[in-house]
Every structure is written in structure tokens, then in C-alpha cells.
Amino acid sequence: MTCQSLIYQLIVLTGKKGWVLASFCSEEAEILYQLQGVNKVIGVKFEACTGISQSRLELLTLLYHADEISQSDLQKKVNIDSAAVTRHLKQLESKGMVSRRRKPEDNRITLVRLTDQGRERIESSKKEKERFMKEMLANVSAEERRLLIDVLARMRNNINNIEA
């Protein structure tokens, strides 16, 4: 039984969330659960507010700053598996936001570019994204934001250095 499932069962039984967390989980476990909780809701809320997933918006943003790029290079930049990139690009292509074509010199390479409609979508998404971020970070001071950036960067580095 994980600490999280134990917590859930104890909360149901006792109705005392704060007491349960303090009594049965380490601070490190609480950090992990809070990060997992944020990760679960941020994508859903972001898409609800902006009308586009974070992954697709990231792809469009990269294409916004590139004239044309190979699909494999795009995949490396976003660090999403190639099957997911293909699915995202197919969906974006069906909505007229990107176009794909085979490279004439090497038919194995697919080139991707942003369409005018995709460029307009990026520009309109900027305001929606800013509003989402502003609401997400409400009640978080500038100093706390800088600290959060630093802590999350160090945690990400630590995670990357964990040997699996």
C-alpha cells in the first residue's frame, strides 16, 4: 500500500486531512504528492482555458520560430515520443494549423511548417496563456516565483541524474 492510498483511506475514515498528512507521510512524500497533483490538473485546466493542449501549443510555438523543420528534429526539441508528435501533428494538420510534406531530396524525411492559420492561433493563444498563468500564480509573490523556478530546476536536474 502506498502512502497516498493509505492517506486516502485514513482521510475517509477520520475526515482529518491535515492530521493524516502530518502523522503518516514524510515531508518528501508530501512534496511528491503535491507535484503529482499539480501535474494532473495543470494540463486539463490549461486546455480548458486556452482551447489547446500544452503539448500542441509547444509544437506550434516551436514552428512559429522556425520556417520549416523536420518532424524528427521537432520531436527532439519537445522531448515527446515520436508517435505522440505524429498524432499531435495529424490533429493540427486536420485543423489547418500546420502543413507537412516529404523532403524532395530524401523521401524518408517529413518537413513541417506553420500555416497562416497556425500563426494566428499562436498569436491569439498568447493572451489566453498569460491569463492562465496569472490566475495559476495568483497569491504567489515574485520572490516565491523565483524560488520556485530555482527549486524546480534543481529537482529536475536531480531527477535526470537518477539512475533507473
Swiss-Prot record:
SMART domains: HTH_ARSR, HTH_MARR
Record keyword DNA-binding present: yes
Cystine pairings recorded for this chain: none
Any GO molecular function: DNA-binding transcription factor activity
Residues annotated as domain HTH marR-type: 28-157
Portion annotated as DNA-binding: 71-94
Superkingdom, taxonomy of origin: Bacteria
Keywords, in A-Z order: DNA-binding, Transcription, Transcription regulation
PANTHER family xref list: TRANSCRIPTIONAL REGULATOR, MARR (PTHR42756), TRANSCRIPTIONAL REPRESSOR OF EMRAB OPERON (PTHR42756:SF1)
Protein name: Uncharacterized HTH-type transcriptional regulator YdgJ
Species for this entry: Bacillus subtilis (strain 168)
Gene for this chain: ydgJ
